[in-house]
């Protein structure tokens, strides 16, 4: 039975004119394989409404799997995230000027949630297709981590049958014309997210393989 996969991306923030997470996600809207049917929704880069928008999308689409995607300018690889932390600590304001500092996302929630996606399998599959990828162990403390933590808190409390997680992606080339920062083509990012969605639909459990970081 094919799995319904919801992929989300953010609108542009921090003076950018595009956000590759949404540019990639919307290309996958309506994509179907033997394993998965993908729908896409845009999320505002706003602490107060990001999670509300995601909850509405989950209610609308009734997915089996949720993959939230965000821009991580400066990263060189596609990075599926392993853990979300219960902290909002914004270096810059969000798109409505909110800048929470040292605030808990959920006062009665745990310190962290693990992803429910097979991130090591996803990373390995991307590499098999020539796409630079690595498991990440920090999703930051801005709206990306806020949404990731909020997603996991929501499904843990209300929809334990849903598997969810987060993937960070690099800039696309048009964003780096005036920056000394790495980028990946939008086509490559779209391929990576398609591989991630199909892999998540195929495998409920992750593989035990060497990973982690030394620092």
Swiss-Prot record:
<comment type="similarity">
    <text>Belongs to the peptidase C15 family.</text>
</comment>
<dbReference type="GO" id="GO:0006508">
    <property type="term" value="P:proteolysis"/>
</dbReference>
<protein>
    <recommendedName>
        <fullName>Pyrrolidone-carboxylate peptidase</fullName>
        <ecNumber>3.4.19.3</ecNumber>
    </recommendedName>
</protein>
<feature type="active site">
    <location>
        <position position="144"/>
    </location>
</feature>
<dbReference type="InterPro" id="IPR000816">
    <property type="entry name" value="Peptidase_C15"/>
</dbReference>
<dbReference type="GO" id="GO:0016920">
    <property type="term" value="F:pyroglutamyl-peptidase activity"/>
</dbReference>
<keyword id="KW-0963">Cytoplasm</keyword>
<dbReference type="InterPro" id="IPR033694">
    <property type="entry name" value="PGPEP1_Cys_AS"/>
</dbReference>
<feature type="active site">
    <location>
        <position position="168"/>
    </location>
</feature>
<comment type="function">
    <text>Removes 5-oxoproline from various penultimate amino acid residues except L-proline.</text>
</comment>
<dbReference type="Pfam" id="PF01470">
    <property type="entry name" value="Peptidase_C15"/>
</dbReference>
<keyword id="KW-0788">Thiol protease</keyword>
<keyword id="KW-0378">Hydrolase</keyword>
<keyword id="KW-0645">Protease</keyword>
<feature type="active site">
    <location>
        <position position="81"/>
    </location>
</feature>
<comment type="subunit">
    <text>Homotetramer.</text>
</comment>
<dbReference type="InterPro" id="IPR033693">
    <property type="entry name" value="PGPEP1_Glu_AS"/>
</dbReference>
<dbReference type="GO" id="GO:0005829">
    <property type="term" value="C:cytosol"/>
</dbReference>
<dbReference type="InterPro" id="IPR016125">
    <property type="entry name" value="Peptidase_C15-like"/>
</dbReference>
<dbReference type="InterPro" id="IPR029762">
    <property type="entry name" value="PGP-I_bact-type"/>
</dbReference>
<dbReference type="InterPro" id="IPR036440">
    <property type="entry name" value="Peptidase_C15-like_sf"/>
</dbReference>
């Amino acid at each position: 039975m094919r799995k319904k996969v919801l992929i989300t991306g953010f609108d542009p923030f921090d003076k950018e004119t595009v956000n590759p997470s949404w540019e990639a996600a919307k290309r996958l809207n309506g994509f179907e394989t033997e394993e998965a049917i993908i729908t896409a929704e845009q999320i505002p880069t706003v602490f107060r409404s990001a999670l509300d928008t995601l909850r509405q999308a989950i209610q609308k689409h009734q997915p089996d799997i949720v993959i939230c995607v965000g821009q991580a300018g400066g990263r060189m690889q596609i990075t599926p995230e392993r853990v979300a932390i219960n902290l909002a600590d914004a270096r810059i304001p969000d798109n409505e000027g909110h800048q929470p500092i040292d605030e808990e996302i959920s006062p009665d929630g745990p310190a962290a949630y693990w992803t429910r996606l097979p991130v090591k399998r996803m990373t390995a599959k991307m590499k098999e297709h020539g796409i630079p990828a690595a498991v990440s162990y920090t999703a930051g403390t801005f709206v990306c981590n806020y949404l990731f933590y909020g997603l996991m808190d929501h499904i843990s409390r209300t929809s334990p049958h849903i598997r969810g997680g987060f993937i960070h992606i690099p800039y696309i080339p048009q964003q780096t014309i005036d920056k000394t920062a790495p980028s990946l083509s939008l086509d490559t990012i779209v391929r990576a997210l398609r591989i991630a969605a199909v892999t998540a639909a195929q495998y409920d459990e992750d593989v035990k393989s060497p990973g982690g970081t030394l620092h």
